[in-house]
């Protein structure tokens, strides 16, 4: 526990110290920044804000985790577990980096196409499964203490879980500070679970990422001076999925990650309903003012018809939802 605390502090300090230099480099080179939705007018002023800040906190968290692990953990099984989780973080970080690079440096608006991104994510998920999950012999899901055996179909579950939550966190990263603190809340919860289980290797990894993310948040809160980009959000979502698998608490991510589930569900519902109503009535209709869900809140509160919410109000609401959901999971696991 003490080692985790030290690693978290080091990650925070290095991340917070390095980020201003990253921002300054971005500005000096006059690199194109984040593009904004025209429908949310209060976001237009953010156009050009440096992005790809996830590169910094991912490098910091990965480096600190590896260094501390190599010097303090002698158990080869623990090292393999840490390297397994870090591998999926790095792979998805590279995918996100490539997507951001194409958007910003090559001026390709959509970056990777949806098919290209999905293909790379599936390839990364397959590597994670065959190199780190399959050798462990895991083929079942822990659902409220009951082991649901999936056999070979566990492969498809892992792919769905990792790809799904990486994209879900990516959708959540739409306003200042929302994704970074939402992920911190999720990681703190998994940190408690790892501590109770005695999985201090996973706890170390969680602690370093929390520290690095908090260092990043110093510059990502409203008004944000930097965004994490796909390089950060895709990697963080994959990390949460991998941790839930490593701790054998896969089901908990549906509740701990309720914010990401809400954001993704809102997009899926909106698109499906729009297509259905367009086919039936000749014109597309919407359930939400705008998706993902945080934009709906910005444009008119919960009902979508009330006063506009500030980014701080949206952040506070969704952070609160995530915190309550996380407490519910801990209560289910250790109280009831």
UniProtKB/Swiss-Prot annotation:
Keywords: Cell cycle, Cell division, Cell membrane, Cell shape, Cell wall biogenesis/degradation, Magnesium, Membrane, Metal-binding, Peptidoglycan synthesis, Transferase, Transmembrane, Transmembrane helix. Pfam families: Glycos_transf_4, MraY_sig1. Its EC number is 2.7.8.13. It is found in: Cell membrane. One of its GO terms (cellular component) is plasma membrane. Catalyzes the initial step of the lipid cycle reactions in the biosynthesis of the cell wall peptidoglycan: transfers peptidoglycan precursor phospho-MurNAc-pentapeptide from UDP-MurNAc-pentapeptide onto the lipid carrier undecaprenyl phosphate, yielding undecaprenyl-pyrophosphoryl-MurNAc-pentapeptide, known as lipid I. This is Phospho-N-acetylmuramoyl-pentapeptide-transferase. It comes from Streptococcus pyogenes serotype M4 (strain MGAS10750). The lineage of its organism: Bacteria, Bacillati, Bacillota, Bacilli, Lactobacillales.
């Amino acid at each position: 526990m003490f080692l985790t605390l030290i690693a978290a502090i080091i990650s925070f300090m290095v991340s917070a110290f390095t980020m201003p230099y990253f921002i300054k480099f971005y500005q000096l080179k006059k690199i194109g920044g984040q593009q904004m939705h025209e429908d949310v007018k209060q976001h237009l002023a953010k156009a050009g804000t440096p992005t790809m800040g996830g590169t910094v906190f991912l490098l910091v968290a990965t480096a600190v985790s590896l260094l501390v692990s190599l010097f303090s953990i002698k158990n080869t099984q623990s090292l393999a577990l840490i390297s397994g989780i870090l591998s999926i973080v790095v792979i998805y970080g590279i995918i996100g980096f490539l997507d951001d690079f194409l958007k910003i440096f090559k001026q390709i608006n959509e970056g990777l196409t949806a098919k290209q991104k999905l293909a790379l994510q599936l390839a990364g998920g397959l590597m994670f499964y065959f190199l780190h999950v399959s050798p462990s012999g895991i083929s079942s899901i822990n659902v409220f203490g009951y082991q649901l055996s999936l056999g070979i179909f566990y492969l498809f579950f892992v792919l769905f879980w990792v790809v799904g939550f990486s994209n879900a966190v990516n959708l959540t990263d739409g306003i200042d500070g929302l994704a970074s603190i939402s992920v911190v809340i999720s990681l703190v919860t998994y940190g408690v679970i790892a501590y109770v289980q005695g999985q201090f290797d996973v706890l170390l990894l969680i602690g370093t990422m929390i520290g690095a993310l908090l260092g990043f948040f110093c510059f990502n809160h409203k008004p944000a001076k930097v965004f994490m980009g796909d390089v950060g959000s895709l990697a963080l979502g994959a990390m949460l999925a991998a941790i839930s698998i490593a701790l054998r608490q896969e089901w908990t991510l549906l509740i701990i990650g309720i914010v990401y589930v809400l954001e993704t569900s809102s997009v899926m519902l909106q698109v499906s309903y729009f297509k259905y109503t367009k086919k039936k009535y000749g014109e597309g209709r919407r359930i939400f003012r705008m998706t993902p869900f945080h934009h709906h809140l910005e444009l008119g509160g919960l009902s979508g018809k009330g006063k506009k919410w500030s980014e701080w109000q949206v952040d506070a609401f969704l952070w609160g939802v995530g915190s309550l959901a996380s407490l519910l999971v801990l209560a289910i696991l250790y109280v009831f």
